Amino acid sequence: MTGKGQGFGFGLGKMKELAEAFKKAQQVQEGAKRLQEELEQMEIQGEAGGGLVKVIVSGNQEPKRVEISPDALAQGADLLSDLVTAAMKDAYIKSTATMRERMEDLTSGLELPGF
């Protein structure tokens, strides 16, 4: 037999915890939307060959532009291809690291009560 007010384990205290959890989830959702907009506007640069080739992507890894110096063009197609690929990888790594850091900032300290 359960005591008064205990019911199915969803007493007033649990309802407050649940309401707080929903409030925090809503805050995270709003923060995630703002973060998504911010990431879209970012320009993160990857480079190769000491700056001969630069690739600029958004915080969401969306390519924005590629800059190739005349010196890189003079190196020939094979080397240019390698430089572009290396710059793309560099930009991708920097962009994903930025996204991960921003997501950690958004969710740090998130304590869902009762879970």
From Swiss-Prot:
Name of the protein this chain belongs to: Nucleoid-associated protein alr5067
Membrane-spanning segments: none
One Gene Ontology molecular-function label: DNA binding
Quaternary structure note: Homodimer.
Cell compartments where the protein resides: Cytoplasm, Nucleoid
InterPro entries listed in its UniProt record: YbaB-like_sf, YbaB/EbfC
Protein family: Belongs to the YbaB/EbfC family.
Main function: Binds to DNA and alters its conformation. May be involved in regulation of gene expression, nucleoid organization and DNA protection.
Superkingdom as given in the UniProt entry: Bacteria
Alphabetic keyword roster: Cytoplasm, DNA-binding
GO CC terms in record: bacterial nucleoid; cytosol
PANTHER family linked to this entry: NUCLEOID-ASSOCIATED PROTEIN YBAB
SUPFAM superfamilies tied to this protein: YbaB-like
Pfam family, one: YbaB_DNA_bd
